Amino acid sequence: MNDINLEQLHNILGRKQYPRITSLETSFLEGKKVLITGANGSIGNKLVQKLTGNNKINLLSTDISGEFERLDITDVKNVKDVVQKFDPDYLINLAGAKHAPEGEVDTWKTFSINTIGTKNLLENISSKTKLLLTSTCKSANPEIVYGASKLIAERMVLNEQGSVARFFNVVETSGNVFEIWNSIPESKPIDIAPTCERHFISLDEAVGLIIFCLNNEPGRYIVNSGPLVKMGDIADRLFPKREKTIIAPRRGDRLTEKFLSTSESIESYFLDTEIIKVKNIHD
């Protein structure tokens, strides 16, 4: 969503971007080997951009396709060859099947990538490697395959003393609703499910959360995103003069997003209150 400006971003978030989380340094990674899976995605590209800004980091960026070294996390041999050869100090798992409606249809693909893929990585890292899983707010009281697949992956990683960076909806990622709205000609109405409520964070905040997790003790972390925002209100703020067509939520979309699950609570705050460590009664 390259054409959205900072004021529009604030309108979507309902707040300004957090200054501390978006300015975290990467000096603690100097001299370390960092492997990223899923580096071709929006968050992956932004993270690669940040880490390559420090030429003292030994970075290996991978994805199943594209410009980076090939790594299919569902392919055990491929994982073994790449991960064991590089032997990273930090492994950031951004690879995943992330589209909720597709997950309800192609359930095995979603489970294979998000859950089995994470298992493959865990089984092929050495004892020195800290694994960070990027996850989703849909893992909190999951109602769909995508959320459930990520919840299982979270538990596996936490059981092995890894960390989880759980994201809310990241505004600037490819394929998001705002990108879709922007692509619709102004002469045509935009489709909205106005009562759907979501938490939002920015792309820079998502990358900042990853950096924070790498440099802190194992656990489950989220950006303190602020209150829920109704999609109808966002559409009215972004496109006050546009005609809107009201539609029902898509298959796989819940009406109200969860901040925490019913078994979770806030353990502690960091960077003032920008980041929250989440505890679960089952930890």
Label the predicted regions:
Residues T26-L29, K33-T52:
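N-terminal Rossmann NAD(P)H-binding glycine-rich loop of SDR-like oxidoreductase domains
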Residues R70-P88:
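Conserved Rossmann-fold cofactor-binding substructure of NAD(P)-dependent oxidoreductases
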Residues F68-R70, S112, I247:
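Conserved residues in the N-terminal Rossmann fold of short-chain dehydrogenase/reductase
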Residues V76, T118-L122, I210:
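Conserved internal alpha-helix within the Rossmann fold of NAD(P)-dependent oxidoreductases
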Residues N55-G66:
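Conserved glycine-rich Rossmann-like NAD(P)H-binding loop of the short-chain dehydrogenase/reductase
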Residues L6-H10, K16-P19, L24-F28, E154, ...:
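Strand-loop microenvironment adjacent to phosphate/nucleotide-handling motifs in alpha/beta enzyme folds
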Residues N93, A97-L151, G162-S163:
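Conserved Rossmann-fold NAD(P)-dependent oxidoreductase catalytic core, especially the SDR/UDP-sugar
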